[in-house]
Amino acid sequence: MKLIAHRNETPGCPENSVASLEYSAQPGIYAVECDVRRTGDGQYVIYHDDTLERLADDKRPVSGVTLEEMRRALAKVNRAVITLDTLTTDYRKKTPILLHVKERTPYPDLIERFERAPVEFIFGVESVAMLEAVRRFTPKDHILAFMPGRDMYPDFIAGGAGIIRLWEDWLNEITPDMVHAAGADQVWIMCNTPEKGMDGTPESLDHFLTIHADGALVSDVAMAADWMKEHGII
């Protein structure tokens, strides 16, 4: 079972930074995850939330500010933001990046950046339109469906996504076996428990193995490393 480091943040390595991605690209980690979205002036930033509220105590949406306004707001709380172009220039590890594409519209300038990127991306898409755009130049084992609804997997499989993401708290209604039977090549599960959130737990990873998951997204890279050592993966 593949382990994917999800939006990791550690002391000295803020989330969605090159430092956090390179820290997370540890032995045994299959891919590292980050997010990209569009600012109001059409720039592409590596940033998870749709607003600045959680990180900068600023309620403005990312889509409603310029890149410079975003940088100023984050600088007030000693944070920064990088662009997609900076990521593809500065990331030096060989571990693939699972790029969660928050935009559902396949803007031509965004797709062009994807197509010429010098790093290995696994594209995580939320819409069939974005899936169709990246499918033109991306093998299906490098396209993951971050589908908004648990019942949408047939559409994403039909569109050419090779990997389907499920949430851990969906598993009482939908299982990897069900999604495999519908034609998915791989099913990855996003850890999510009331106690640990998306950090993940050894118990969850053990369970995912028993239900035939092909991968798991975890935020606690140290826990993942210990689990891999225990299972002889590293």
Regions found by a protein language model. Give the residues of each.
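Phosphate-group recognition and catalysis centered on beta-loop-alpha active-site segments
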Residues: 1-234
